[in-house]
Amino acid sequence: MRILHTSDWHLGQNFYSKSREAEHQAFLDWLLETAQTHQVDAIIVAGDVFDTGSPPSYARTLYNRFVVNLQQTGCHLVVLAGNHDSVATLNESRDIMAFLNTTVVASAGHAPQILPRRDGTPGAVLCPIPFLRPRDIITSQAGLNGIEKQQHLLAAITDYYQQHYADACKLRGDQPLPIIATGHLTTVGASKSDAVRDIYIGTLDAFPAQNFPPADYIALGHIHRAQIIGGMEHVRYCGSPIPLSFDECGKSKYVHLVTFSNGKLESVENLNVPVTQPMAVLKGDLASITAQLEQWRDVSQEPPVWLDIEITTDEYLHDIQRKIQALTESLPVEVLLVRRSREQRERVLASQQRETLSELSVEEVFNRRLALEELDESQQQRLQHLFTTTLHTLAGEHEA
């Protein structure tokens, strides 16, 4: 029995006003080819198929077309909802998908099922667990403090997994089949990136890996970096197939090829997802940024490299956007973001905390607040204009 474990596609993501359609199409084409090459029996998508609850039409088209094309290979597809997915959006095509060898699990309450091989024989027992919304698994209780709410939710998630595993064992019976569980949540020790949202805000930071049942493989989603959890080879995040934030660029992206033999986990192989949209982060003062940009001088690059430029100088130059534009206009790059480095923002905030409002003019307060936002030059100019107009209006009313 062979499966491909993938997650966090985020179809339809708007990345600083840029579409990811071409990248996602290339990934899905590669995934289809990979499933055929390795004669995979099933593909498990562990949540966040879409980036929003109301994905754009092209994202739905990518999803639907992939399901149709995969059906021709005999490979079964299991799609589980993540915290970004809308239950209603996934469920609207669930019955049609069932005729296309695809199981859609959008919410809690789905019992374990037999996952077939390509030839139709039983291959594994699947505990199809999507993102568990608190309202689906716990009853609200009045009077609980924060710690009690956290313990209540932790116990509910643990019980849900343990009950599903017990039901899976009954379904398996005496058959030599592995048990595969899924999940879409943060586990203790997982390394997150900037694009990952907290999903149990104020109640549960992370789920302890030791609370998972002893399934043969646990296919997790929500964290965008591939990683093994708690030193347990069978508990894994595969990560997203493309970088979803600039702090993910430069790191390999994977799909896990998981092989079972005689009802047990045999191997997990990381398959590198090809990069189709280059991205880079440049960090330093203006002179350093200028030097780093030279690596693309006289280079033919298609598509252009998407850049995040982090300025580390003490003085965040007012016309930095214009200077960066002049430096890059003849290079095969596209600057999507210009900002202070995180360390610089923290230093600026720390120094400003020693000042009082009485020491600053209204304009200084506004300019410092504006500098903390990641806005392009046109947006900054518009806000500056609106602010200046407002000041003049207020001054006129005061004089009147």
Swiss-Prot record:
Share an example GO biological-process annotation for this protein: DNA repair
What molecular function terms (GO) are annotated for this protein?
A: 3'-5' exonuclease activity; DNA binding; DNA exonuclease activity; double-stranded DNA endonuclease activity; single-stranded DNA endodeoxyribonuclease activity
Annotated SUPFAM superfamilies: Metallo-dependent phosphatases
Q: Which InterPro entries match?
A: Calcineurin-like_PHP_ApaH, DNA_Repair-Maintenance_Comp, Metallo-depent_PP-like, Mre11_N, SbcD, SbcD_C
Q: Which UniProt keywords apply?
A: DNA recombination, DNA replication, Endonuclease, Exonuclease, Hydrolase, Nuclease
Source superkingdom? Bacteria
* Cellular component annotations (GO), alphabetically ordered: DNA repair complex
One matching Pfam family is: SbcD_C
NCBIfam families, per this entry? PRK10966.1, sbcd
Assigned protein family:
Belongs to the SbcD family.
Quaternary structure annotation from Swiss-Prot or TrEMBL: Heterodimer of SbcC and SbcD.
User: What is the purpose of this protein?
Assistant: SbcCD cleaves DNA hairpin structures. These structures can inhibit DNA replication and are intermediates in certain DNA recombination reactions. The complex acts as a 3'->5' double strand exonuclease that can open hairpins. It also has a 5' single-strand endonuclease activity.
Q: What is this protein called?
A: Nuclease SbcCD subunit D
